[in-house]
Amino acid sequence: MEEFHCIDSNRLANAFPHPRLALAEPNGLLAVGGDLSPERLIMAYRQGIFPWYNQGQPILWWSPDPRLILFPQQLHISRSLHKRLRRGIYQVTLDLDFPGVIQACASPRQDGEGTWITSEMKSAYNRLHEMGIAHSVETWEDKELIGGLYGVSIGRIFFGESMFSKRPDASKIAFVYLCRQLQRWGFPLIDCQIQSEHLQRLGAQTLPRNKFLHWLHEFSNSPSLKRPWHFDPDLLKNSL
């Protein structure tokens, strides 16, 4: 019988087993317990591990195989999305309202379902943002936040966490601008974590976990960018 690892909250060093020990079913479940301290979260991301659990559950840590990733230069922009981008009716910013983005991502969806972003998760990622490790992209209509996404940056790897839209394509527009900026900064890939038809339509693809870990180990130790993040001015002026 396969078992997963229980993490001691009082122990940080060597807290996680190797991702290859993750369960096949449910795919990628590796460990349970611990905490969401910045140190533990950073350690987890560096090893290709992320937390994902629902309210009332213990903290669950995952490293699925295969892994969904997107190479920024292979981003697919549909004809309808391209048309909306060219119209330029929305404004896009970086790191302007991280708390607002994560709160919107945590809000119940239109279908009435809640999300996995608990108050504990919000507090943890807000701390990472204050440290310059977690970042947000915001899409605005006038002064209203209508879409966006947030994630974690370690070295030259961006780990996408969640996105939301209150208007058609608002989160996709945020994602397009993020991809273009990360491409300029030399980020080779975006970790999209688990399979998603929404992201696959934008060009995301699956990689075997061992190949993803190879990319991660090569680029997660690159120098991190200074905080806060900003889009290059010419990127915002030009049509994508």
From Swiss-Prot:
EC number: 2.3.2.6
GO biological process: protein catabolic process
Reactions listed under catalytic activity: N-terminal L-lysyl-[protein] + L-leucyl-tRNA(Leu) = N-terminal L-leucyl-L-lysyl-[protein] + tRNA(Leu) + H(+); N-terminal L-arginyl-[protein] + L-leucyl-tRNA(Leu) = N-terminal L-leucyl-L-arginyl-[protein] + tRNA(Leu) + H(+); L-phenylalanyl-tRNA(Phe) + an N-terminal L-alpha-aminoacyl-[protein] = an N-terminal L-phenylalanyl-L-alpha-aminoacyl-[protein] + tRNA(Phe)
Annotated keywords: Acyltransferase, Cytoplasm, Transferase
A single MF term (Gene Ontology): leucyl-tRNA--protein transferase activity
Enzyme kind, highest EC tier: transferase
Family assignment from sequence similarity: Belongs to the L/F-transferase family.
Protein name per the record: Leucyl/phenylalanyl-tRNA--protein transferase
Organism: Nitrosococcus oceani (strain ATCC 19707 / BCRC 17464 / JCM 30415 / NCIMB 11848 / C-107)
